[in-house]
Curated annotation (Swiss-Prot):
Disulfide bonds: none annotated. This is Large ribosomal subunit protein uL16. Keywords: Ribonucleoprotein, Ribosomal protein, RNA-binding, rRNA-binding, tRNA-binding. The lineage of its organism: Bacteria, Bacillati, Actinomycetota, Actinomycetes, Kineosporiales. Binds 23S rRNA and is also seen to make contacts with the A and possibly P site tRNAs. Coiled coil: none annotated. Part of the 50S ribosomal subunit. Pfam families: Ribosomal_L16. The gene is rplP. It comes from the Bacteria. The keyword RNA-binding applies. CDD domains: Ribosomal_L16_L10e. GO terms for biological process: translation. It comes from Kineococcus radiotolerans (strain ATCC BAA-149 / DSM 14245 / SRS30216). HAMAP family: Ribosomal_uL16.
Length: 138
Protein backbone atom coordinates (compact mmCIF):
# COMPACT_ATOMS: atom_id res chain seq x y z
CA UNK A 1 0.00 0.00 0.00
CA UNK A 2 1.05 3.57 -0.59
CA UNK A 3 2.04 5.31 2.65
CA UNK A 4 4.53 8.18 3.08
CA UNK A 5 7.77 7.17 4.79
CA UNK A 6 7.92 10.28 6.92
CA UNK A 7 5.90 13.47 7.14
CA UNK A 8 6.67 16.85 8.62
CA UNK A 9 3.38 17.04 10.53
CA UNK A 10 1.59 13.92 11.74
CA UNK A 11 -1.87 15.54 11.75
CA UNK A 12 -3.06 17.94 9.05
CA UNK A 13 -6.15 19.89 8.11
CA UNK A 14 -8.56 18.33 5.63
CA UNK A 15 -7.71 19.31 2.04
CA UNK A 16 -10.11 21.56 0.15
CA UNK A 17 -12.39 20.02 -2.47
CA UNK A 18 -13.05 23.16 -4.49
CA UNK A 19 -11.85 23.82 -8.03
CA UNK A 20 -10.69 21.69 -10.92
CA UNK A 21 -7.38 19.91 -11.35
CA UNK A 22 -4.64 22.15 -12.73
CA UNK A 23 -2.09 19.43 -13.50
CA UNK A 24 -2.25 15.78 -14.45
CA UNK A 25 -5.24 16.23 -16.73
CA UNK A 26 -3.88 14.36 -19.76
CA UNK A 27 -2.87 10.78 -20.44
CA UNK A 28 0.91 11.06 -20.79
CA UNK A 29 2.47 7.65 -20.08
CA UNK A 30 -0.03 5.04 -21.27
CA UNK A 31 -2.68 4.76 -23.98
CA UNK A 32 -5.78 4.77 -21.76
CA UNK A 33 -6.58 6.39 -18.44
CA UNK A 34 -9.14 6.87 -15.67
CA UNK A 35 -10.19 10.52 -15.27
CA UNK A 36 -12.15 11.81 -12.28
CA UNK A 37 -15.41 13.54 -13.19
CA UNK A 38 -16.09 14.74 -9.64
CA UNK A 39 -13.89 15.58 -6.68
CA UNK A 40 -13.37 13.68 -3.46
CA UNK A 41 -10.95 11.69 -1.36
CA UNK A 42 -9.39 8.35 -2.35
CA UNK A 43 -7.73 6.27 0.37
CA UNK A 44 -4.57 4.21 -0.02
CA UNK A 45 -6.61 0.99 0.24
CA UNK A 46 -8.90 2.06 -2.60
CA UNK A 47 -5.91 2.90 -4.80
CA UNK A 48 -4.38 -0.51 -4.09
CA UNK A 49 -7.69 -2.28 -4.73
CA UNK A 50 -8.07 -0.55 -8.11
CA UNK A 51 -4.47 -1.40 -9.04
CA UNK A 52 -5.02 -5.08 -8.23
CA UNK A 53 -8.25 -5.11 -10.26
CA UNK A 54 -6.39 -3.77 -13.31
CA UNK A 55 -3.33 -6.03 -13.03
CA UNK A 56 -5.35 -9.19 -12.50
CA UNK A 57 -7.42 -8.53 -15.60
CA UNK A 58 -4.57 -7.66 -17.97
CA UNK A 59 -2.24 -10.35 -16.55
CA UNK A 60 1.20 -9.77 -18.11
CA UNK A 61 0.30 -7.91 -21.29
CA UNK A 62 0.49 -4.24 -20.31
CA UNK A 63 1.84 -1.64 -17.92
CA UNK A 64 0.02 0.38 -15.24
CA UNK A 65 0.89 3.85 -13.94
CA UNK A 66 -0.59 5.33 -10.74
CA UNK A 67 -0.62 9.13 -10.97
CA UNK A 68 -1.98 9.91 -7.49
CA UNK A 69 -0.39 9.47 -4.09
CA UNK A 70 -2.11 9.44 -0.67
CA UNK A 71 -0.03 12.03 1.16
CA UNK A 72 -2.62 13.45 3.57
CA UNK A 73 -3.44 11.77 6.91
CA UNK A 74 -7.08 11.49 7.99
CA UNK A 75 -7.67 11.24 11.72
CA UNK A 76 -10.37 9.47 13.68
CA UNK A 77 -11.31 9.42 17.34
CA UNK A 78 -12.00 6.08 19.04
CA UNK A 79 -15.56 4.81 19.38
CA UNK A 80 -17.54 5.91 22.45
CA UNK A 81 -15.15 8.75 23.24
CA UNK A 82 -16.37 12.07 24.60
CA UNK A 83 -15.90 15.14 22.45
CA UNK A 84 -12.91 17.34 23.04
CA UNK A 85 -9.54 16.25 24.41
CA UNK A 86 -7.68 16.91 21.19
CA UNK A 87 -7.61 15.58 17.68
CA UNK A 88 -7.84 11.85 17.01
CA UNK A 89 -4.98 9.65 15.85
CA UNK A 90 -4.16 9.24 12.13
CA UNK A 91 -6.28 6.38 10.82
CA UNK A 92 -5.65 6.28 7.06
CA UNK A 93 -4.02 8.20 4.22
CA UNK A 94 -5.94 9.97 1.46
CA UNK A 95 -5.28 11.61 -1.88
CA UNK A 96 -7.31 14.72 -2.69
CA UNK A 97 -8.89 14.25 -6.13
CA UNK A 98 -10.20 17.18 -8.15
CA UNK A 99 -12.35 16.96 -11.30
CA UNK A 100 -10.31 16.36 -14.45
CA UNK A 101 -7.46 14.50 -12.75
CA UNK A 102 -6.11 11.38 -14.51
CA UNK A 103 -5.60 8.88 -11.69
CA UNK A 104 -4.50 5.69 -13.47
CA UNK A 105 -2.93 5.07 -16.87
CA UNK A 106 -2.63 1.83 -18.79
CA UNK A 107 -0.85 0.72 -21.94
CA UNK A 108 -2.24 -2.43 -23.50
CA UNK A 109 -2.39 -3.70 -27.12
CA UNK A 110 -6.14 -4.43 -27.33
CA UNK A 111 -8.68 -1.72 -26.51
CA UNK A 112 -11.44 -4.09 -25.39
CA UNK A 113 -9.41 -5.71 -22.59
CA UNK A 114 -7.93 -2.35 -21.54
CA UNK A 115 -11.33 -0.69 -21.15
CA UNK A 116 -12.70 -3.72 -19.29
CA UNK A 117 -9.76 -3.61 -16.86
CA UNK A 118 -10.22 0.13 -16.26
CA UNK A 119 -13.98 -0.35 -15.76
CA UNK A 120 -13.25 -2.87 -13.01
CA UNK A 121 -10.94 -0.34 -11.36
CA UNK A 122 -13.57 2.42 -11.60
CA UNK A 123 -15.97 0.26 -9.56
CA UNK A 124 -13.42 0.25 -6.71
CA UNK A 125 -13.11 4.04 -6.55
CA UNK A 126 -15.45 6.35 -4.56
CA UNK A 127 -15.52 9.18 -7.14
CA UNK A 128 -17.27 9.26 -10.51
CA UNK A 129 -14.79 8.51 -13.29
CA UNK A 130 -14.59 8.02 -17.03
CA UNK A 131 -12.18 6.26 -19.36
CA UNK A 132 -10.10 8.53 -21.60
CA UNK A 133 -7.66 7.85 -24.43
CA UNK A 134 -4.35 9.47 -25.19
CA UNK A 135 -4.72 12.48 -27.47
CA UNK A 136 -2.96 12.42 -30.82
CA UNK A 137 -4.17 9.01 -32.05
CA UNK A 138 -0.95 7.14 -31.29
Amino acid sequence: MLIPRRVKHRKQHHPTRRGAASGGTRVTFGDYGIMAVEGGYVTNRQIESARIAITRHIRRGGKVWINIYPDRPLTKKPAETRMGSGKGSPEWWIANIKPGRVMFELSFPTEKIATEALTRAIHKLPVKCKIVRREGGE
